[in-house]
Amino acid sequence: MNPSRRSPLTWAVHLSVLLLVLLWTLPTAGLLISSLRDKDQLAVSGWWTALSSSSRNAVVRAPSAEDQVERDGKFVISGNLLEGRGEVSAFGFSSREPTKFKPGETAELNDGERLTVQSDGSFEIVSDQRMEGSRGQRIFFTATTPPRFTLDNYAEVLSAAGIGRSFLNSLTVAVPSTVIPILIAAFAAYALAWMPFPGRAVLLAVVVGLLVVPLQMSLIPLLQLYNGVGAFFGVSAKTYMGIWLAHTGFGLPLAIYLLRNYMAGLPREIMESARVDGASDFDIFVKIILPLSFPALASFAIFQFLWTWNDLLVAIVFLGAGDDKLVLTGRLVNLLGSRGGNWEILTASAFITIVVPLIVFFALQRYLVRGLLAGSVKGG
């Protein structure tokens, strides 16, 4: 068989991988494109139409009679519907017939008033007599606007009050919440992998069982425990130490399980040779196990950092929603408003929040696969 010829199974695998890559990449690309689009266009068309003109229906109220001017014996109110962007394709003065007239045509209004709208959005309301009334005429129109990309969405998010403080709060939460469970889990994993003691198998089974416990079930009991301990010592329960301990508790089962599997797959001969040379368990752990286990440590660090950085629920419960301790995800939720309809803010915020996780991922990603797969077959 010619080795240069690939089997149908190989082609099927490659196509499947390509399909998975596209399924993961396309939503991210759509998010990026949406974050750079004008908010009016984003509200009426999808990101896949970003390079084509978009059509939207809108209504604008003309200036009131106080702004009318006299010109050649006529009274005129003028303005522009589009603010210099796009082209009007139809207009009207009633919600029942919003596209009754074409640009350049004249619509007869009440009391002898006449409305004319041009394709560039400029309009005039002309009357032979002085116009009365405190409210301006409503003008319905359909406009076609060319594609427009802008950084205004990012500027609005970055200029919001408290963003810088919330960014530092998220770092203050995420970094210790990643380092602390790694340190604790590394010692526990070494003991479960290489230090025989009674009940080791039962303890490992308990750790595996904790992996399936829903986080939400333990939030309220833990908060009550923290409040009780805080009241006993006379300190507030909603502190950084509290959320560090919470994230440590939630992350330890996965960390211990992942690191134990990796350490159990390391060559036994290395540890035995070190013991023959008089090395203690602590020396073996620090000088041999930890350096060899760096891929597994980096793999868990990626998962833990991503979780704690993007977390909102645990941060609100254990840290609170005060301005001085609000994390970045909480600040961005406040920017979206109660209805969450500001898509331009949502898309720009999403890309701002993933900058730091992307840096962490690309810095450690070469260890990710090695850390997840090594030790998955061979056990200690």
Swiss-Prot record:
It is a multi-pass membrane protein. CDD domains: TM_PBP2. It is found in: Cell inner membrane. It holds the Pfam family BPD_transp_1. The chain crosses the membrane at residues 13-33, 179-199, 202-222, 239-259, 288-308, 344-364. One of its GO terms (cellular component) is plasma membrane. InterPro entries: MetI-like, MetI-like_sf. Keywords: Cell inner membrane, Cell membrane, Membrane, Sugar transport, Transmembrane, Transmembrane helix, Transport. Residues 167-364 form the ABC transmembrane type-1 domain. One of its GO terms (biological process) is transmembrane transport. Belongs to the binding-protein-dependent transport system permease family. MalFG subfamily. Part of the binding-protein-dependent transport system for alpha-glucosides such as sucrose, maltose and trehalose. Probably responsible for the translocation of the substrate across the membrane. This is Alpha-glucoside transport system permease protein AglG. It comes from Rhizobium meliloti (strain 1021) (Ensifer meliloti). The gene is aglG.
